[in-house]
Amino acid sequence: MAQMEVSYSRRLDYQYMMIETDEEARSDYRLSMLINNRINGFLPVHVQQMNGKSTLSYEITSLENLPEFLDARKITYDEMVSLLLQFCSAVSEVGRYLLDGEGILLEPQYIYVSKSLERIRFCYYPYQHMPLHQSVNVL
């Protein structure tokens, strides 16, 4: 996986998780798919390039990452089932856009949920090259 540096930013009423990578955003179909489509279950993303590096900005407005959410309260069995179903749906959804599961960041700090847990959003990072089954083990 490419070296990545994560930071957070607030602009007006929006919040972003920004991942700076040493990969230059080249004409990569995966990146184009992410930028030009709203993929259900995934954080919207914008890309900025400067000095041979790329910054992917993921909108996280009104969401909190999974560890923060779980620190604040426990989830029920039904909520856990809902999270797992949404994960399965997201994996299926990336296939519709010719993306593979390797780009889904499954580390808990990159998984975002709404305050009511009605929706879960994953981060798709096109420069990750870890098979999905290995990423699930990390989770």
Question: Where do the PLM segments sit?
Answer:
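Conserved activation segment
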Residues: 80, 104, 120
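Short, charge-rich binding segments
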Residues: 48-49, 95-97
